[in-house]
Amino acid sequence: MKLQTLQALICIEEVGSLRAAAQLLHLSQPALSAAIQQLEDELKAPLLVRTKRGVSLTSFGQAFMKHARLIVTESRRAQEEIGQLRGRWEGHITFAASPAIALAALPLALASFAREFPDVTVNVRDGMYPAVSPQLRDGTLDFALTAAHKHDIDTDLEAQPLYVSDVVIVGQRQHPMANATRLAELQECRWAFSSAPRGPGAIIRNAFARYGLPEPKLGLVCESFLALPGVVAHSDLLTTMPRTLYERNAFKDQLCSIPLQDALPNPTIYVLRRHDLPVTPAAAGLIRWIQHHALQTG
């Protein structure tokens, strides 16, 4: 089983075509097909099936792909770690970040990291727990920065707390309940449920339950934090969002934070990674910069 063949299989799965994968890998299509055939012979199972739209993974291929990605990732990380320990600070870091930290500590952390390690390539993706779990497991992500509840985190993941996110209730500036001080005053309002580790609207639903109130009235579900401020600014909906998102969005002048005296659940932001898959020295350095700036801005 050759590493290059596993890389080729991953490429085929990503582009969905033998021809396109062969071009990207600078191989002839017959040579690529022969390599995949040899891998299938070794595994004694078909990995790919041809369709009208190209090629796709069989059930065997889907099962094997998780292992292929992990093998390729661990091989790359091992090479990068040895190189970094020898003083050659190159390589790649891929991680996911939730909106709260992406707007606050992350820009400063990335700038500091780039000054220290200018030759390390960083790839940042949007992502929240638990959606990021499969990519953490197969090694696609080195780590994730996301809100989570400690008891909900899978046991194969290591969770290192960064800070507690400050959550606020937000509505358009002229909202009738703009000056409300108690959750009970918001019972008749409609809500835009945003994504959360325990499902859309979990924060406000938990808050209502804590104070013995009925379920909040659902107006819509908005899983895009980028769209959420604009949706609320042009409607009568209320929503919850991290204070950093409320204070740093294009619709800030059209929004208000409801001055509640009742406490809201404030989720913890964690660094999540596989506990049995150590990060490279460069990734550890980036995490240290994130921790440093999170303490200042969280």
UniProtKB/Swiss-Prot annotation:
Signal peptide limits: none
Transcription regulation as UniProt keyword: yes
GO molecular function: DNA binding; DNA-binding transcription factor activity
Superkingdom of source: Bacteria
Assigned keywords, A-Z: DNA-binding, Plasmid, Transcription, Transcription regulation
GO cellular component: cytosol
DNA bind region: 18-37
Record: residues binding toluene-4-sulfonate: S98, A100
Disulfide linkage: none
Pfam families with a match to the protein in the record: HTH_1, LysR_substrate
Domain HTH lysR-type: 1-58
KW Cell division (keyword) present: no
Annotated control of activity: Sensitive to oxygen.
Gene3D superfamilies per the UniProt record, alphabetical: Periplasmic binding protein-like II, Winged helix-like DNA-binding domain superfamily/Winged helix DNA-binding domain
Similarity field: Belongs to the LysR transcriptional regulatory family.
Function: Regulates expression of the tsaMBCD1 operon and of tsaT in response to p-toluenesulfonate (TSA). Acts by binding directly to the promoter region. Binding to the tsa promoter depends on TSA concentration.
Subunit annotation: Homotetramer. Dimer of dimers related by a twofold axis.
Protein name per UniProt: HTH-type transcriptional regulator TsaR
Top-level taxonomy: Bacteria, Pseudomonadati, Pseudomonadota, Betaproteobacteria, Burkholderiales
